[in-house]
């Protein structure tokens, strides 16, 4: 199926406001995306920090349950993220009508996929008991997974609204919603875990409420600022499917393999799983700014293609690689020289801390290379080449 934009291939090239200030535009987009993208990880990180003081079993449960919840969500997440490419190219072409149609298509897909994700998650919840070394850790995993899964529809609606705004070049509205959601999560999680003593269930419930509020705030901002979602047809839904499916399959396979690894680790001991959770949260938290830079570059590349200014794509790609590479190199050095200090923030158990530090040393090795990989794949998605990016992601 051909995109409406493909019928305009002979259209006159359009100027872009950022073509003479690429670095400024990249940073302007990237830092709010960093805050917004950190949302899911920050919420899980808060749960990890709070529950970690209850012992290894609850910590292992949050780690495995949070990973499994994201694994069930990742196909839908990857599918809906395709709207950013479509919208950025529509913005470059000056087609506001297509922006509205793609936003509507993404919201429709979010509702349907969200309901399917909840149904699948509730069926899979009993299996979580068998993904941990002890019965206590298994119960914690099942509880956390089951509750987090309930937020899937609202989380995906938030993704649809957020990715559309990214494509339009607005990263600050999603950031504002993220800040509100995370402040709510911190307050509620502290109340539920330490005051009401709800443990793992309290941490998960706080996150579900916070995710719902975050999506609600973004929806409200859209109403106030006149964002429209209308005009979606089968063609627009088909274009979202065409762009989103390769990325969705890639995410599903990547996260699926990661969950399998986490399940194997969790079957060894609570300490191994807890250490894995600490290292994972630190890596995700530190890596997402580089991911945000790559996402910002993807938006600029998409707008360049839509405006028929393909000569701008390569300079944007080179700039993205330089910025992301420098950042990930600094993170690797921090892991090596400050690993013990980082681990001490999560646990006072010396055995657990030592294991986590060793995992951070491993992360320091691949962090920079992974940053370059993500940057290249995001640029490819921005120009519409989602298949090659997906193949590389699956193979590597």
Model-assigned labels for residue ranges:
Residues 28, 51-70, 136-143, 200-201, ...:
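Interfacial/gating helices of multi-pass transporter permease domains
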């Amino acid at each position: 199926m051909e995109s409406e934009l493909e019928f305009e291939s002979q259209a006159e090239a359009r100027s872009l406001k950022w073509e003479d200030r690429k670095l400024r535009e990249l940073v302007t987009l990237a830092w709010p995306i960093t805050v917004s993208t950190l949302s899911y990880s920050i919420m899980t990180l808060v749960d990890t920090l709070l529950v970690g003081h209850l012992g290894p079993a609850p910590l292992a449960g949050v780690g495995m349950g949070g990973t499994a919840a994201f694994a069930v969500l990742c196909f839908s997440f990857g599918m809906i993220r395709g709207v950013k490419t479509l919208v950025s190219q529509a913005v470059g072409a000056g087609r506001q009508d297509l922006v509205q149609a793609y936003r509507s298509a993404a919201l429709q897909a979010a509702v349907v996929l969200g309901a399917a994700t909840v149904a699948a998650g509730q069926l899979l919840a009993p299996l979580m008991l068998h993904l941990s070394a002890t019965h206590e850790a298994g119960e914690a995993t099942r509880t956390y997974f089951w509750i987090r899964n309930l937020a899937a529809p609202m989380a995906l609606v938030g993704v649809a609204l957020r990715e559309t705004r990214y494509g339009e070049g607005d990263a600050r509205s999603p950031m504002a919603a993220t800040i509100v959601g995370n402040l709510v999560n911190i307050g509620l999680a502290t109340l539920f875990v330490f005051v009401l003593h709800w443990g793992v269930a309290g941490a998960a419930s706080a996150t579900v409420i916070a995710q719902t509020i975050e999506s609600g705030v973004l929806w409200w901002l859209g109403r106030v600022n006149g964002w429209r979602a209308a005009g979606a047809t089968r063609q627009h839904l088909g274009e979202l499917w065409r762009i989103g499916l390769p990325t969705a399959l890639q995410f599903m396979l990547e996260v699926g393999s990661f969950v399998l690894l986490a399940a194997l680790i969790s079957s060894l001991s609570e300490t191994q799983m807890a250490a894995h959770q600490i290292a994972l949260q630190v890596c995700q938290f530190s890596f997402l700014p580089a991911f945000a830079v790559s996402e910002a570059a993807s938006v600029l590349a998409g707008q360049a293609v839509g405006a028929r200014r393909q000569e701008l794509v390569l300079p944007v790609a080179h700039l993205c690689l330089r910025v992301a590479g420098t950042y990930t190199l600094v993170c690797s050095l921090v892991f090596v020289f400050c690993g013990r200090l980082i681990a001490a923030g999560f646990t006072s158990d010396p055995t657990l801390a030592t294991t986590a530090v060793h995992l951070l040393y491993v992360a320091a090795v691949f962090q920079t290379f992974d940053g370059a990989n993500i940057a290249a794949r995001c640029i490819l998605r921005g120009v519409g080449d989602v298949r090659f990016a997906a193949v590389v992601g699956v193979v590597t």
